[in-house]
UniProtKB/Swiss-Prot annotation:
<feature type="disulfide bond">
    <location>
        <begin position="43"/>
        <end position="92"/>
    </location>
</feature>
<comment type="function">
    <text>Promotes spermatogenesis and ovulation by stimulating the testes and ovaries to synthesize steroids.</text>
</comment>
<protein>
    <recommendedName>
        <fullName>Lutropin/choriogonadotropin subunit beta</fullName>
    </recommendedName>
</protein>
<feature type="region of interest" description="Disordered">
    <location>
        <begin position="131"/>
        <end position="169"/>
    </location>
</feature>
<feature type="glycosylation site" description="N-linked (GlcNAc...) asparagine">
    <location>
        <position position="158"/>
    </location>
</feature>
<dbReference type="Pfam" id="PF00007">
    <property type="entry name" value="Cys_knot"/>
</dbReference>
<keyword id="KW-0372">Hormone</keyword>
<feature type="disulfide bond">
    <location>
        <begin position="113"/>
        <end position="120"/>
    </location>
</feature>
<comment type="similarity">
    <text>Belongs to the glycoprotein hormones subunit beta family.</text>
</comment>
<keyword id="KW-0325">Glycoprotein</keyword>
<dbReference type="InterPro" id="IPR001545">
    <property type="entry name" value="Gonadotropin_bsu"/>
</dbReference>
<feature type="disulfide bond">
    <location>
        <begin position="46"/>
        <end position="130"/>
    </location>
</feature>
<feature type="compositionally biased region" description="Polar residues">
    <location>
        <begin position="155"/>
        <end position="169"/>
    </location>
</feature>
<dbReference type="GO" id="GO:0007186">
    <property type="term" value="P:G protein-coupled receptor signaling pathway"/>
</dbReference>
<feature type="glycosylation site" description="N-linked (GlcNAc...) asparagine">
    <location>
        <position position="33"/>
    </location>
</feature>
<dbReference type="InterPro" id="IPR029034">
    <property type="entry name" value="Cystine-knot_cytokine"/>
</dbReference>
<dbReference type="InterPro" id="IPR018245">
    <property type="entry name" value="Gonadotropin_bsu_CS"/>
</dbReference>
């Protein structure tokens, strides 16, 4: 009887684990809409805009005996295809380019995280929104539509796939 109970418990845990990993609580890697912030040091106004980024769950594994074997690379949700769009920052002084370009996700996939070009999580060195200013020049974030786009770039899986502010100097 004890062996039958152990077998039943093992089956329930096995099926429950498979069901939980495929449930609606973990949406798979896909393009989603996100609001980002853009600013330039010389321009007085920070704006927010909506674009599509790659986000979602990528299946991963962890070794049971990590000391015996090297770590398994963990996949991240990243761009498969993208295009670039641009926005114009209002109020920039003469001689300062008011255009800021950013990637727009067309399709996503689970792939390796390339630290050189991708935000792989962890602490951020800049905020995800417009910073409040103490001076009278406001950096309140008015919403801005996209102004121009370029052609899709297939196979560009090494672009940043998480919402980051676009800040240029």
């Amino acid at each position: 009887m004890e062996m039958l109970q152990g077998l039943l418990l093992w089956m329930l845990l096995s099926v429950g684990g498979v069901w939980a990993s495929r449930g609606p609580l973990r949406p798979l890697c896909r393009p989603i809409n996100a609001t980002l912030a853009a600013e330039k040091e010389a321009c007085p106004i920070c704006i927010t805009f909506t674009t599509s980024i790659c986000a979602g769950y990528c299946p991963s594994m962890v070794r049971v005996m990590p000391a015996a074997l090297p770590p398994i690379p963990q996949p991240v949700c990243t761009y498969r295809e993208l295009r670039f769009a641009s926005i114009r920052l209002p109020g920039c002084p003469p001689g300062v380019d008011p255009m800021v370009s950013f990637p727009v996700a067309l399709s996503c996939h689970c792939g390796p995280c390339r630290l050189k070009t991708t935000d792989c999580g962890g602490p951020r060195d800049h905020p995800l929104a417009c910073a409040p200013q103490a001076s009278s020049s406001s950096k309140d974030p008015p919403s801005q539509p996209l102004t121009s786009t370029s052609t899709p770039t297939p196979g560009a899986s090494n672009r940043s796939s998480h919402p980051l502010p676009i800040k240029t100097s």
